[in-house]
Amino acid sequence: MNPGFDAVDQETAAAQAVADAHGVPFLGIRGMSDGPGDPLHLPGFPVQFFVYKQIAANNAARVTEAFLQNWAGV
């Protein structure tokens, strides 16, 4: 892994490869749910999993909404 990166996303890359193979436009937006450490100092699993999963989902939704509004010129 390149030390200049904080994360690697292999799942979206696979989806992109399938879309490319079939000539389908593709844009992937992901929210990262697990990073280094625990900035919220939560109890362990499963609390951390569910809290950070929701934060990641909310962040991905906000980015997607902003992208679509910008793309549509709203």
From Swiss-Prot:
One of its GO terms (biological process) is nucleoside metabolic process. Keywords: Signal. InterPro entries: Nucleoside_phosphorylase_d, Nucleoside_phosphorylase_sf. One of its GO terms (molecular function) is catalytic activity. SUPFAM superfamilies: Purine and uridine phosphorylases. It comes from the Bacteria. Residues 1-19 form the signal peptide. The keyword Signal applies. The keyword Signal applies. Pfam families: PNP_UDP_1 (PF01048). This is Uncharacterized protein Mb2315c. The lineage of its organism: Bacteria, Bacillati, Actinomycetota, Actinomycetes, Mycobacteriales.
